[in-house]
Amino acid sequence: MNIQYDKSKIESTLKETSIDDSDLSNVVYLVEDPHTAENFDEISKQIAAKVRMGHKPRSCDALYRSGKYYNLIEFKNRKSADLRIGNEMVELHEKAFDSLGQLAIYLNYQNSLDNLAKETRLVVVYNDGKGAEEATSDIAS
């Protein structure tokens, strides 16, 4: 499937993709990392529009390429312990699965999803009560 993407809407940074603006009176960036990343929510939106899906599938927040790996990053502005409550882990697994399929479409990946999965890491960034200024990212190393 060959989709033309609007790269100007996809190109971003890890900082910008980590934003939690659900409360406009308290906008939080989970990381301050200026490294280039791709807005995976936007990629998902563009794929859904092109293949005429009735809804946008679940997607991770960012795609960061590091060496031979594709890093799908999900930012969660909550404590790690909260990720184990209720359906949070199930939703995270579903989001990772949907994102892997979308990544294959985005990359026009010709091998199996199993091979792509071996080249992909899921990174979950959470906030255990520290301010955004204390959050760090070591994915770039």
Language model regions located:
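Catalytic micro-motifs at enzyme active sites that drive phosphoryl/nucleotidyl and oxygen chemistry
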Residues: V51-R52, D61, Y109-L113
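Conserved catalytic cores of phosphodiester-cleaving nucleases, focusing on short active-site segments
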Residues: A62-Y64, Y69-N77, S99
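Beta-rich catalytic cores
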Residues: R58
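Basic, amphipathic N-terminal segments that precede the first structured/catalytic domain
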Residues: M1-H55
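Catalytic cores of nucleic-acid endonucleases
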Residues: R78-A132
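Glutamate identity and glutamate-enriched acidic tracts
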Residues: E11, E16, E32, E38, ...
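Polybasic (Lys/Arg-rich)
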Residues: T136-S141
